[in-house]
Design a protein with these regions (language model features):
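Generic recognition of short, well-ordered alpha-helical interface segments
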Residues: 16-20, 45, 100
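Hydrophobic hinge/microswitch elements
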Residues: 31-76, 83-84, 98
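Secondary-structure junction motif
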Residues: 6-28
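Tryptophan-centric aromatic hotspots in well-structured domains and transmembrane helices
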Residues: 18-24, 41, 61, 88, ...
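Structured beta->alpha junctions
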Residues: 10-13, 39, 81, 94
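C-terminal effector-binding regulatory domain of bacterial HTH transcription factors
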Residues: 62-67, 71, 79-131
């Protein structure tokens, strides 16, 4: 892996827990080589596009790359997942919780999230088993 160009998303989260190659290598117990070739990008989608174009290997958020992995456009070169600890929450004002449109939207978004989670779990089942 260290012989390849590593693609970096320079976007930083507020809490400082954005995935990074240094953290990934520490997570899997491999010494990080600072002489490794890097390409830096300012947005997650640019990193994904660079990986799709064959410019290097990227750390990708599973929800953003799951369809590319399923289609075979991208592959998982190392079966070691790195859980980010990020989560999503669906909230609404209390006075709108009875609104039929809001309830329907909540039902739909939960269904989409469950479908996405099912795809991700199926795709990454071997990655998490070996961590």
């Amino acid at each position: 892996l260290l012989a390849h160009t590593l693609l970096i998303d320079d976007t930083r989260s507020i809490d400082g827990y954005s995935p990074s190659w240094q953290r990934w290598f520490a997570h899997v117990g491999v010494p990080f080589n600072k002489n490794t070739a890097f390409k830096r990008f300012g947005q997650s989608n640019m990193v994904i596009q660079a990986a799709l174009a064959g410019q290097g290997i990227a750390l990708g958020r599973s929800a953003l790359v799951v369809d590319d992995l399923i289609s075979g456009e991208l592959v998982i070169p190392v079966k070691k997942a790195f859980p980010s600890g990020f989560g999503h929450f669906l909230v609404s004002p209390k006075n709108r919780s009875r609104n039929p449109s809001a309830r329907e939207f909540c039902r739909w978004i939960k269904m989409q999230a469950e479908l996405s989670q099912t795809k991700i779990h199926w795709l990454l089942r071997d990655c998490f088993a070996k961590v």
